[in-house]
C-alpha cells in the first residue's frame, strides 16, 4: 500500500519475509483452505523468489500461483529502463522512490540526506545509494544478483503462470527467451508472453468503450483450472 512502514528498512524486489509470514499465518488459521497467490511487477519477482526458496514446503501450502510483468533479471531491467522510451517509466518510478526515501530519512537521519537522494538520476543509482546499503547488500550488483527471480525459477514446485508482455518497458525481450528455456525444463511453469501488453496492462478489444482485460481473465482461468484439478484429485475414491 501507500503507507510507509516505520522501520529503517524499505521494501525491495527480493524481500520474501513479509510474504512468508503472511502465508504462514493463513495456513495456520485455514489449514485446509486452497490457497493461490498472484504477484504483479516487483510483487511477482518476490513471489517467484519465495516459491524457489521454499521449493520443499511451498507445494504443501499453495495450490497455484501467477506472476505478472515480472522483472526477472533486475540488472538487465535496470539497464533497459534507462534507455529510450523506457526512461519515461523510470522517471515516474524513480520520483516515487525518492519521495519515499526522503520521508524515511526524516525518521532515520543516518540514511542518505535529501540532497543526495534528489541528485539520483537512475534506478541503478538509487539501488546503489539507498536500496543496497539499507538492506545489507554490498551494492546494486550484489542486490540484483541475489534478488533476481530468474535464478530461482528452476526450483519452483508449485504450478505457476508467468505472464509477461514482450513490449514491457521494464525488461529487454531477450530475458523472456531465457525464461522460456528455463520453463521448458520445469513442468510446473506455464509461460504466456504475448507481443503486446506493456507493464501490467494487457488491455485489448476493438471497442475502446468495451475493453478486454486479458490479465484478469488469463490469471483467473489459470488459477480456477488448478483449483479444479486439485479438487478432483482430493475427491478420487
Regions found by a protein language model. Give the residues of each.
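Short beta-strand/loop motif that positions the catalytic acidic residue
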Residues: 156, 162-164
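Alpha/beta-hydrolase-fold enzymes
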Residues: 30-134
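Acidic beta-to-alpha connecting loop that harbors the catalytic carboxylate
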Residues: 150, 166-169, 176, 196-198
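Catalytic histidine-centered segment of alpha/beta-hydrolase-like enzymes
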Residues: 197-212
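Glycine-rich "HGGG/HGxG" loop immediately N-terminal to the catalytic nucleophile
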Residues: 1-10, 202-203
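Active-site nucleophile elbow and catalytic-triad environment of alpha/beta-hydrolase enzymes
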Residues: 129-152
Amino acid at each position: 500500500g501507500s503507507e510507509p512502514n516505520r522501520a529503517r528498512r524499505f521494501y525491495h524486489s527480493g524481500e520474501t519475509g513479509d510474504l512468508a509470514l503472511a502465508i504462514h499465518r493463513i495456513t495456520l488459521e485455514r489449514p485446509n483452505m486452497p490457497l493461490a497467490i498472484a504477484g504483479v511487477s516487483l510483487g511477482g519477482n518476490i513471489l517467484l523468489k519465495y516459491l524457489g526458496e521454499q521449493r520443499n514446503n511451498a507445494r504443501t501450502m499453495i495450490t497455484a500461483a501467477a506472476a505478472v510483468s515480472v522483472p526477472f533479471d533486475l540488472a538487465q531491467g535496470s539497464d533497459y529502463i534507462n534507455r529510450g522510451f523506457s526512461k519515461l517509466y523510470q522517471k515516474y518510478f524513480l520520483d516515487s522512490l525518492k519521495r519515499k526515501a526522503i520521508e524515511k530519512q526524516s525518521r532515520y537521519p543516518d540514511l542518505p540526506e535529501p540532497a543526495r537522494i534528489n541528485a539520483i538520476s537512475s534506478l541503478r543509482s538509487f539501488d546503489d545509494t539507498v536500496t543496497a546499503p539499507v538492506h545489507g547488500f554490498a551494492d546494486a550488483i550484489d542486490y540484483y544478483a541475489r534478488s533476481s527471480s530468474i535464478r530461482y525459477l528452476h526450483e519452483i514446485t508449485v504450478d505457476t503462470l508467468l505472464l509477461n508482455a514482450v513490449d514491457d518497458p521494464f525488461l529487454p525481450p531477450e530475458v523472456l527467451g531465457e525464461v522460456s528455456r528455463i520453463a521448458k525444463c520445469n513442468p510446473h511453469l506455464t509461460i504466456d508472453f504475448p507481443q503486446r501488453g506493456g507493464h501490467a496492462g494487457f488491455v485489448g478489444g476493438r471497442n475502446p468503450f468495451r475493453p478486454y482485460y486479458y490479465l484478469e481473465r488469463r490469471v483467473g482461468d489459470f488459477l480456477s483450472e488448478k483449483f479444479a484439478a486439485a479438487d478432483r484429485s482430493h475427491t478420487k475414491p
